[in-house]
Amino acid sequence: MTDIAVLVHGAGSCPATAALLLGPAVPDGVTPVAVTARADVESVVDVVDAAAHGCRVVLVAGISLGAHAAALWAVRGGRADSLLLAMPAWTGAPDPVAALTGRSADEIARRGRAAVLAEISAAAEGDWVVEELRRGWETYDDDALVAALRAAAGSTGPTRTELAAIRTPTAVVALADDPLHPESVARTWSAAIPGAALGIVGRHEPATDRGALGRTGRTLLRGA
């Protein structure tokens, strides 16, 4: 039986970004499996389950919507040695952060992803988040990207009650000063999950160390 780590990207992102940001959390000797997650969170839970089938799952690591899916997978009986939940975006019913994702989808539908990305890039030149956004968006056509973002915006995240049911050793990692993935949400998740460890990565730290989120998670899980 193969030992694997399932890596789950966020809405509008891609497996390459998940591997880059979360890969350092994968223990030595474990095979990373970066899945494609282009649907609503319930469908992404099924993707994680399919990837895990027939393997020993050492780690499930998700970022943004991928973190939501990883948590729900564990709640629903998925078995892993550990969880890394990075940059969760909301808890329970879609909130104003989800609405921002929906508005991004509307803008792309109206103007096209190239125009929207150019505007974002001009407003935040050199920002690593924008660079990773570009990496992800360029793997979609406009219709597919709009569909993925709208699916994410309408997805319910894990509730506090569901998070409290997780029994897998868990690290929750926030990115400081990120309005789309508020630190307060990560704190809520870590407080709700029994025994979870919380880490905060500086907003600009991944600019020079893309693996900072994954590395922080691995350090936290070693202490769990």
Task: List each language-model region with its residue ranges.
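Conserved HGGG/HGGXW glycine-rich cap/lid loop of the alpha/beta-hydrolase fold
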Residues: M1-V41
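Conserved acidic catalytic loop of the alpha/beta-hydrolase fold
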Residues: V41-V58
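Gly/Ala-rich beta-loop-alpha elbow adjacent to hydrolase catalytic centers
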Residues: A61-A70
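Flexible "cap/lid" loop of the alpha/beta hydrolase fold
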Residues: V75-A109
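Hydrophobic, aromatic-rich cap/lid helix
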Residues: E131-R160
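Short beta-strand/loop motif that positions the catalytic acidic residue
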Residues: A165-I166, V172-A174
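Conserved alpha/beta-hydrolase "acid-adjacent" motif
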Residues: P179-V185
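Catalytic active-site module of serine/aspartate enzymes centered on a nucleophile-bearing elbow/loop
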Residues: P194-A224
